[in-house]
Amino acid sequence: MSRIGKLPITIPEGVKVSLNDLEVRISGPKGELSKTFKGNIVVLLAENKLLVKPLAVSKNARAMWGTARSIISNMVTGVKEGFQLKLEVNGVGYRAMVKGKYLNLMLAKSHNTKIEIPPDIKIDVPKQNIIILEGIDKEKLGQFASIIIKQRPPEPYKGKGIRFENQFIPRKEGKKN
C-alpha cells in the first residue's frame, strides 16, 4: 500500500479536471496542463477529489502509483498558484540578464552564454546575481533550472557558481604549504 498514492487529491475552486482514458487534463486560473499516464494506473474523479489506483499488483504499477499521484497533485497546485524557483549567481564578475527571449549569463568564460527561455516559463532578474523562475509546470521549471545551473555549477573551494537560493554547498579547505 502506497502511503502517498492512497491519499486523495482535493480539487480547489476554479480548477477544472477532465479525464480521457489515460490522459488527465487540468485547467485553472494560471493555465492548462495535461499528462498521459501509461496503463498501470487509473485516475478516478469522485466528489471534487481525484483518486489514483493501481490496475495491477506488479512492482511497476505500485512504483508508479505514488509517483502519478504526486505529479497530478503538482499539476493542480501549478494551475492554481504556480511555482517559483530562485537561483543565486555567486562570483566576481558573474552576472545574469534577460535580453528578449534569451537569458544571457556572464560566467567568466571566453564568451557569454545564451539560453533560450521556454515559452511557458517567466524569468525575472531583479539584481544581476538573482534569477527568479516562474511557471505552472514544476517538472519543466526544474529541468530549466538544472540547465542554467549546469553552465557553472557551484564549486566547493570559493563557492562560485550558480545554485538554488539557500542551497548548502559543503566547503573544502584549500591547499596547505
From Swiss-Prot:
Pfam families: Ribosomal_L6. Coiled coil: none annotated. The keyword Transmembrane helix does not apply. GO terms for molecular function: rRNA binding; structural constituent of ribosome. GO terms for cellular component: ribonucleoprotein complex; ribosome. HAMAP family: Ribosomal_uL6_B (MF_01365_B). Keywords: Ribonucleoprotein, Ribosomal protein, RNA-binding, rRNA-binding. This is Large ribosomal subunit protein uL6. This protein binds to the 23S rRNA, and is important in its secondary structure. It is located near the subunit interface in the base of the L7/L12 stalk, and near the tRNA binding site of the peptidyltransferase center. NCBIfam families: L6_bact. Gene3D superfamilies: Ribosomal protein L6, alpha-beta domain. Belongs to the universal ribosomal protein uL6 family. One of its GO terms (biological process) is cytoplasmic translation. PROSITE patterns: RIBOSOMAL_L6_1. The keyword RNA-binding applies. Disulfide bonds: none annotated. PANTHER family: 60S/50S RIBOSOMAL PROTEIN L6/L9, LARGE RIBOSOMAL SUBUNIT PROTEIN UL6M. SUPFAM superfamilies: Ribosomal protein L6. Part of the 50S ribosomal subunit. InterPro entries: Ribosomal_uL6-like, Ribosomal_uL6-like_a/b-dom_sf, Ribosomal_uL6_a/b-dom, Ribosomal_uL6_bac-type, Ribosomal_uL6_CS. The gene is rplF.
